Amino acid sequence: MNVPDINRSILRMHIATIEAKYPIKIIGLLPRGSVGHVFEDNALDFLAEKRPGLDLLGLAGAEVSLSDLLGRPVGIVLKSGLKGREAEEFPRIVEPV
């Protein structure tokens, strides 16, 4: 199934809301399927940087909050958590928002 395009200005607005609420910086969009814990076809996968104070609960909260704002499932991968091939590949393939 093809994922419909999302309005980039609305996406940026919602990302700014999440970044103001949680200690996280969204770098951009990853190709669908990059986040292993989100399986829905219409999900959006993001690469993010961890800011001081972010814990697992905050990361989960950011995912849920952004998902609620966008009306579709969201997965967030932290750049600091990448290892091996993904640590090299994801920063190169991320699409800025």
Indicate where each model-derived feature is located.
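Catalytic core of pol beta-like nucleotidyltransferases
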Residues: M1-P31, V35-E40, K50-V97
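Short glycine-rich His-centered loop
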Residues: L44-D45
